[in-house]
C-alpha cells in the first residue's frame, strides 16, 4: 500500500452538516472544473459594482469641496483688501495684507539683514528623550 493514497479525503456527510458546509463543499468540488465562472466572474462583478457605488461618492466629495470654495463678491474682496490701493474710490487696503515691491527691492531688504552673526539655540527636550549630544 502506498504511503499517500490517491483517493481524496472527504468527511462523512452527516445529518449535523450545516447548509453552509454543504454549499462550501459543493463550491470547492466544482471550482477546479470552472474557475472563471465560479471565481473570476464574481470578482469582476464586484469590481464593476464597486465602481458604480463609488462614483456618486466621489462626486459628492467634489461637490462638498466646491461648496466650500466659492467666488468672492466685490464687497467681500474689498473687505479682504484684494482690490484697489488706498484712496481709490474709497476702497481701503487691508493693513495685514503684505504687499511686496519689485524683486530688486526685496533683494536689498534681505541683504540688509545680518545673516552672519547668529547663534544656534537648542530646544528643550522632553524627559527621557535623547538630546543628540554625544
From Swiss-Prot:
Q: Which GO terms describe its biological process?
A: mitochondrial cytochrome c oxidase assembly
Residues crossing the lipid bilayer are 35-55
Where does the protein end up?
Mitochondrion inner membrane
Q: Kindly give the membrane topology term recorded for this protein.
A: Single-pass membrane protein
Nuclease is among the record's keywords: no
- One GO CC annotation: mitochondrial inner membrane
Which keywords label this protein?
Membrane, Mitochondrion, Mitochondrion inner membrane, Transit peptide, Transmembrane, Transmembrane helix
* Highest taxon listed in the record's lineage: Eukaryota
Q: Does the keyword Mitochondrion apply?
A: yes
* Transit peptide endpoints, chain numbering: 1-12
Entry function: Required for the assembly of the mitochondrial respiratory chain complex IV (CIV), also known as cytochrome c oxidase. May participate in merging the COX1 and COX2 assembly lines.
**Family per record:** Belongs to the COX16 family.
| UniProt protein name | Cytochrome c oxidase assembly protein cox16, mitochondrial
Q: Which organism is it from?
A: Emericella nidulans (strain FGSC A4 / ATCC 38163 / CBS 112.46 / NRRL 194 / M139) (Aspergillus nidulans)
**What does UniProt list as this organism's lineage?**
Eukaryota, Fungi, Dikarya, Ascomycota, Pezizomycotina
